[in-house]
Amino acid sequence: MHEMSIAISIIDAVAAKAEAEHADTVTIVELEVGKVAGVEVESLKFCFSAAAKNTVAEGAELAVCEVEPVGECEACGQRFPVAFHVATCTSCGSFKTNIVSGRELLIKSITIE
């Protein structure tokens, strides 16, 4: 379960930000997680809650915004929604595509007190 290592990394970043701001408590951590990032959101929330014990983030809400995957065609430049990891251009049918969105795992904001 790699979600625990991700949760610990998030807690480390959150704790560093809280320390830099001389804050005692973190109330909300907002994440952007791409739907093809390979992260199970419910597992991440569980792991975050466990990893936050006895830290400034204990009891903090982990708010997750899931980002839909978007592909871009190298042949025609068209952008299109991606249903799976294999993306075929919906405009020209080319297989020369890249996923340009949907793999994110970003801390978007931290609310501290």
From Swiss-Prot:
Disulfide bonds: none annotated. Zn(2+) binds at C73, C76, C89, C92. It comes from the Bacteria. InterPro entries: Hydgase_Ni_incorp_HypA/HybF_CS, HypA/HybF. GO terms for molecular function: nickel cation binding; zinc ion binding. Gene3D superfamilies: 3.30.2320.80. Ni(2+) binds at H2. Keywords: Metal-binding, Nickel, Zinc. GO terms for biological process: protein maturation; protein modification process. Pfam families: HypA (PF01155). Belongs to the HypA/HybF family. Involved in the maturation of [NiFe] hydrogenases. Required for nickel insertion into the metal center of the hydrogenase. HAMAP family: HypA_HybF (MF_00213). This is Hydrogenase maturation factor HypA. It comes from Chlorobium phaeobacteroides (strain BS1). The gene is hypA.
